[in-house]
């Protein structure tokens, strides 16, 4: 139950922030929908590996293989903090560990193009399950 409350707090904080940002421009329903989508992306990243594409700030398209699951990140790359979110999640920003670049990267939610696949891991010894995720719309 406490995890559900924390999840709802994160979503409401995100929606409140997004309400006054472009492209929501005051549309609370749109901001809430986007906040739920951001939470879904973060859950995918916490559960295993995610293959996705987004537009970089310079306009280039970037395809990435990322995670925030501590079991899949090298021990030297895990931030030394007491926060459960690795690293601290900022409003409107999705942070992930890039397995191709061996480093932490981030992108703004509105630049996400698509999620190609999600591989989830229940424990380090299990075989991953794969889910084609498709578009978020």
Can you describe what each PLM-predicted range is?
Residues 2-23, 31, 35:
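Amphipathic alpha-helical segments in structured regions that serve as interaction surfaces
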Residues 46-54:
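A short, Trp-centered hydrophobic/proline-enriched beta-strand micro-motif
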């Amino acid at each position: 139950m406490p995890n559900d409350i924390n999840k709802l707090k994160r979503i409401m904080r995100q929606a409140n922030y997004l309400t006054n940002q472009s492209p929501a421009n005051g549309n609370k329903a749109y901001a809430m929908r986007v906040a739920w989508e951001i939470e879904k992306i973060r859950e995918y990243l916490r559960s295993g590996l995610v293959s996705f594409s987004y537009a970089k700030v310079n306009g280039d398209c970037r395809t990435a293989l990322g995670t925030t699951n501590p079991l899949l990140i090298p021990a030297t790359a895990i931030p030394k903090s007491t926060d459960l979110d690795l690293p601290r999640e900022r409003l409107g920003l999705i942070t992930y560990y890039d397995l191709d670049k061996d480093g932490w990267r981030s992108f703004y939610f509105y630049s996400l193009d698509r999620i190609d696949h999600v591989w989830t891991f229940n424990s380090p010894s299990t075989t991953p399950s794969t889910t084609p995720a498709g578009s978020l719309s």
